[in-house]
Amino acid sequence: MLWLQGGPGGSSLFGLFIEHGPFFVNASLSITERTIAWSKKYNMIYVDQPAGTGFSFTDDANGYATNQYEVARDLYEALAQFYTLFPELLDNDFFVTGESYGGLFVCLYFKLLKHS
């Protein structure tokens, strides 16, 4: 399952550590295992996107998306690279979800996927 945070420009680390990842950051800023986590049922992929969000970056200024369609294209290319590195996961069911503005990128990603 691919998780896309809202924003735009919201780091998916928020979803990972605050909402539904296997661990959460508690009030004393230590990490605690979450008893109910999506990762107990699904293999999770948390992506900081577009480039420049969270820990995502590029050394080339031309690598930054200038519109939502470029963001979807970059995500498509990132996932293609992911599956090149981990082909054993290709047979797994694949879900894409997100919240707030991340939901827009979910729709754009599938539109791109449909036409590719």
Predicted features and spans:
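Short, intrinsically disordered, charge-balanced linker/junction segments flanking boundaries
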Residues: 97, 104, 115-116
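N-terminal cap/lid subdomain of alpha/beta-hydrolase-fold enzymes
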Residues: 1-73, 80, 84, 109-115
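Catalytic nucleophile-elbow at a beta strand-turn-alpha helix junction centered on a G-D-S/GDSL motif
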Residues: 48, 100-103
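Short helix immediately C-terminal to the catalytic nucleophile in hydrolase catalytic domains
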Residues: 102, 106-110
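Alpha/beta-hydrolase fold nucleophile elbow
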Residues: 87-101
